[in-house]
């Protein structure tokens, strides 16, 4: 299962687009402040560093989008636990 695009929202929800065309809304608030995810406490960091690395939802730690210097979430976790939604970008015109 591979992630191809992400769209973070300021409520710690992220729209996660998968290669099979499904879109899942996944809330990461349960991770914020815990271990490696403590950086997500900073909402600006959370939004501005949210990206796709290693085929999944990730946050670059150095701004260089290095696949080894990031925090990420297993795409299967997102796929199984996220809520399937319609593309939120369809409604923006």
Language-model segments: residues:
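Motif-centric detector for short Cys/His coordination patterns
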Residues: 1-93
């Amino acid at each position: 299962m591979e992630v191809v695009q992400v769209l973070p929202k300021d409520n710690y929800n992220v729209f996660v687009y998968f290669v099979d065309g499904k879109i899942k809304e996944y809330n990461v608030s349960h991770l914020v402040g815990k271990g490696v995810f403590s950086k997500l406490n900073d909402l600006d960091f959370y939004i501005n560093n949210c990206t796709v690395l290693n085929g999944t939802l990730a946050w670059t730690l150095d701004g260089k989008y290095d696949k080894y210097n990031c925090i990420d979430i297993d795409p299967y976790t997102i796929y199984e636990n996220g809520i399937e939604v319609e593309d939120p970008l369809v409604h923006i015109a």
